[in-house]
Regions:
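Conserved N-terminal beta1-alpha1 strand-loop-helix module at the mouth
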Residues: 1-91, 96-124, 140, 150-159, ...
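A short acidic, helix-capping loop that chelates divalent metal ions and anchors anionic groups
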Residues: 74, 131-137
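Conserved acetyl-CoA-binding loop-helix of GNAT-fold acetyltransferases
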Residues: 144-147
Length: 208
């Protein structure tokens, strides 16, 4: 099984790119050092999603591409992996469907969720929201650094912190035990995509 060899996990939302083409924004981020992208475009019809994945595989050969929830697309196109929600198919079921080289990520929102993900065989988890952020308010109030610290002490699983992550906050979550960070608007909405990416990468690596 391939290792989790990235610390910055870019999650997509083509509606948050300030009108710029998603593929162009992602290409700039990858050029600046992003090595893992989760394609999270839930409102796209399946054929459009399939075509977009193929385009990204051509345009972003240096990035591991994860598909949110659509295990069928991930398996059919042999992407870098698949990313599940807590309401998705169980991780253990999905694991049996994946190619050996594919990684399995899981989004969780509590300490119990982190521990369950490890037991189910996920390769890594995305935990949050750590800080307040509009895109994550549907999951409830921020859980804060304390839950992150507790989770990092209880599992061996790589934990990516999400929710309101900026370059300054990236240092704090790394110090709290996060393996890495997952971001959307901090990169997608930045005026200078490459600079925003480099700032986050520098912050993440301080305590590596």
């Amino acid at each position: 099984m391939s290792p989790v060899d990235f610390r910055l996990y870019l999650v997509t939302d083509r509606h948050q790119t300030a009108g710029r083409p998603l593929v162009s924004v992602l290409a700039q981020a990858v050029r600046a050092g992003v090595r893992a992208v989760q394609l999270r475009e839930r409102d796209l019809p399946i054929r459009e999603l399939h075509a977009l994945v193929q385009e990204l595989q051509r345009e972003l050969p240096d990035a591991r591409l994860f598909i949110n929830d659509r295990v069928d697309v991930a398996v059919a196109l042999r992407t870098g992996g698949v990313h599940l929600r807590e309401s998705s198919l169980p991780a253990g079921v999905v694991r049996d469907l994946l190619w050996p080289s594919q990684l399995l990520g899981l989004s969780v929102h509590s300490l119990d969720g982190v521990m369950a993900a490890e037991q189910q065989g996920a390769d890594f988890v995305v935990l949050g929201p750590i800080y307040d952020t509009p895109s994550k308010r549907v999951y409830g109030p921020p859980i804060g650094l304390r839950i992150l610290e507790q989770a990092a002490q209880k599992v061996q699983l790589p934990i990516f912190a999400i929710g309101g992550i900026t370059a300054t906050r990236a240092r704090a979550v790394r110090q709290a035990g996060a393996f890495g960070v997952a971001v959307l608007s901090s990169i997608l909405g930045a005026e200078n995509i490459e600079q925003a990416t480099q700032d986050l990468l520098s912050a993440i690596e301080i305590d590596s």
